[in-house]
Amino acid sequence: MSKTFEYVICGGGTVGCVLASRLSLAGHSVLLIEAGPEDYNDRIMSPVAAPHLHGTEWEHNLMTTKQPGLGNRSVPNYAGKLLSGSSGINYGLWTRGHSVDYDSWAKAVGDERWNYANMLKYFQKTETQISTTAAARIYPLREPIRNAMVAAGLDYNPDPNGGNPLGFGPFTENWKNALRQPASKAYDLSKATVLTNSVIARVDFDDPKTTATGVTLTDGTQYTATSEVLVTCGALKTPQLLMLSGIGPQQHLAQHNIPIIADLPVGENYHDKISATFFWKLRHPEKGYALGSPRFNKPEFRHGNPIEWVATVPTPHAELIKATQQDQIDSDDPYLQKPRGNVEVMVAYAPIAGGGSEFRLPMDGTHISSPVVLLLPTSRGRITLASADPTADPVLDPGYLDTETDRAAIRAGMRVALRLMETESAKEVIDGETPPPGHEPLTSACSDADLDRRVQIVGSSFFQNGGTAAMGTVVDTQCRVKGVRNLRVCDASVLSVPLAGHYQAPMYALGEAVADMLLAQ
């Protein structure tokens, strides 16, 4: 095997696979290096297996520091550790997000290539509409839940991926023929050299320490990049690799005796989305309304997540203004200019709890759930090194719910979830909320303090990490690391602000956009 390539890609995740495919098919020599294995076993490929992949060898199983916003709990945070990355272990959600988010991103960094109109072609390039839901995969509670959303005052949105997700609409997934579509299968890697089960120790630089020249693995093997090194390890692991390579905050690197190459705020600006879930007891579980019931047994129900509707809602304006004033957010901030998709509310026909939640129920067909996801967190944390050992886990401090703006948003979403189940349509099938032991059921009229206490028990990561090598401070608008040459970061680390959606679709689009930049050189 050659040790020299035009491009060396560090991380065989979603974006890494896109870049390796596009560059190699265009005739460039490409080495794609992944820390985990290449695996397509049934546990990975099944659409309903994702909850059971947490804690396995196919994930980086990380823990946050104790989070004051979550009752001083440490909660799990996961990232894919296999060829395909998180596209190989995620829940298959396919959401582009809100056009306003992309337009704000472009304005903030001063480059219109990142606005929604320009990113749309990259979404479309990676998408193929293969089907709508098969008639046999219509769940028993489809109409009662739809009617509840209407009764709760939510507007129907037939295309939440059309640039404005506000309202409620169909839940969109990217399974094909009842199988996962990992990036390494969806994109042709036949012309790329793929190296799995290989951990990168550092990015190498030339003698003046200004130009990236390749990488060194933990076993000492070195590979040379004659054009560029592309870092695509994901928002949790990319900052670790950069800092181990001398790219990061000078004072922090000095603590670990790492020679500085570029003093940049790597690991800062860390944002992640949290979720809080309600469980609802069914009036007639014997009718087969939920996963775990013997009558919830159509084969088509295993073709995707047991979810049909998703709502995206803004924080009520008066509450938003009050909270942002408390946080001293400038009135000109784009966050305040238009209604944004602050929170997502789903109804799952199973008691789906977030990773790290202290309250769980068995999947025995007696309960459904409402996951509430904070889509646009304003809280910021940081990722740091625990040591200079590349096999050690980084230290994650996301700062969950540090701002009143975030607390107001998650409360607003929780009230929507409660209001849904207080409608007459929902009450026909729902007996009520099952709260954590020792707690009373909540209502939409409960106090803010009641909601805050609940989040401290059930709040957990939704595994949508970003911002740790942010565009504008760490990389430029072409994802090139500042202060050095021939080094780019191409993953959710570059998202200086969150997007109101799940990051799978945006990361595919990001990969396509960066591939176009490289091929245009």
Curated annotation (Swiss-Prot):
PROSITE patterns: GMC_OXRED_2 (PS00624). InterPro entries: FAD/NAD-bd_sf, GMC_OxRdtase, GMC_OxRdtase_N, GMC_OxRtase_C. It is an enzyme of class 1 (oxidoreductase). One of its GO terms (biological process) is secondary metabolite biosynthetic process. Its EC number is 1.1.-.-. Its cofactor is FAD. Pfam families: GMC_oxred_C, GMC_oxred_N. One of its GO terms (molecular function) is flavin adenine dinucleotide binding. Keywords: FAD, Flavoprotein, Oxidoreductase. FAD binds at T14, V15, E34, A35, L82, N90, Y91, G92, L93, A492, Y503, Q504. Belongs to the GMC oxidoreductase family. GMC-type oxidoreductase; part of the gene cluster that mediates the biosynthesis of aculins. The pathway begins with the synthesis of 6-methylsalicylic acid by the polyketide synthase (PKS) acuA via condensation of acetate and malonate units. The 6-methylsalicylic acid decarboxylase acuB then catalyzes the decarboxylation of 6-methylsalicylic acid to yield m-cresol (also known as 3-methylphenol). These first reactions occur in the cytosol. This is GMC-type oxidoreductase acuG.
